[in-house]
Amino acid sequence: MQMRELNEYPQPAVLAAQERILAVNEKAAALFREMEAGGELPEVLHSVQGSWEGSVTLEGRRYRVAATVREEGTLYLIHPEEQQALGEGQLDGALYQMRLLMGDFRRELAPYAAGERDRFAGEDMEQFTRSYYRMLRLMDHMDLLRDAAAGQLSANRERLDLDRLCAVAAMECGSLLGGMGITVEYHGPAGAVPVVGDGAMLRDALLELISNCARRRRQGGVLKLSLSCKGKWARICVTDDGDAPTAKEKLGLTGRGAMPLIPGPERGAGLGLSVAETVMRLHGGALLVSTGEGAPGVYLTMPTSQRSGESLSLNTPGPERNAGMNPYLIALSDVLPGEMIREDWKW
């Protein structure tokens, strides 16, 4: 690629190969002090191979990056990103799902209000419980995104083993999804992966990937949760044994397609990956959507903490968002049948 061609892009553009910067256009050179031809590419940009799109932090600011693999290397097109509240399509989807759930509550309680039944049990209990968990999940998502848009979202900072967090999530989700014929496998590194962050938030971000993948395998199959490290970055991905999502489907997961669709009744409100992206941003990481055909859909990436004695700034613990209920059941409530959720209900 000639420099003249690179300068024709209206946004900052960087061409790199083998983790080294080959060229930057004039806009990128003016914007980034640390990126120049011959220098090292920031680790977050090569934490995931292939073509992808996502929001990352570069020199202290958030940018929307689209990476495209070309013959001469990978081209990165960079756009400044503004903090925003729920997107219009996401808000429509959330309100649509809330109306559906309120209708479910009315239908499930109507026979008792009319005196036709006097004991709340059996299938009615199962459906009511499932609707309750789904409503709780929806409210959790909207609450977190609202706080993030207002700049009021904070994370506890504690030392965590990301390998352990992933292993526990795979075990807990596997025990639940096993009843649907879905097996969850975990593949991680040989040792611990130390990170600094909020364990509950990171767990919930991971559960969004598992939940989305489980929806694709409702008739059974295998989900594979993998954790790997490259340099000072950790990378998490969840895949299944079915066909990989198309590029259009993957962009639709984050509501960034040309015509984002409001999810159907059993597809959630479409907020899950936005929540995961918000959590990763809060931890200095990113949610990256692989745009290549046949590639896994979504990655979570974040920096590891290898330095001992690192100084941490501690925050006051935030509110417990799951009302003390099983977070794995909440995350999978759009996927699991009612009888499986009922077992966790305590009167």
Predicted regions mapped to residue ranges:
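Conserved micro-motifs of the catalytic ATP-binding
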Residues: 150-155, 194-197
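Sensory modules in modular signal-transduction proteins
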Residues: 1-28, 94-96, 103, 147, ...
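Glycine-rich phosphate-binding loop
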Residues: 265-275
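Short beta-strand/loop element within the Bergerat-fold HATPase_c
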Residues: 222-232
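A conserved beta-strand-to-alpha-helix junction within the catalytic ATP-binding
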Residues: 156-171
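Conserved glycine-rich
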Residues: 284-285
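Conserved catalytic submotifs in the C-terminal HATPase_c
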Residues: 158, 183-193
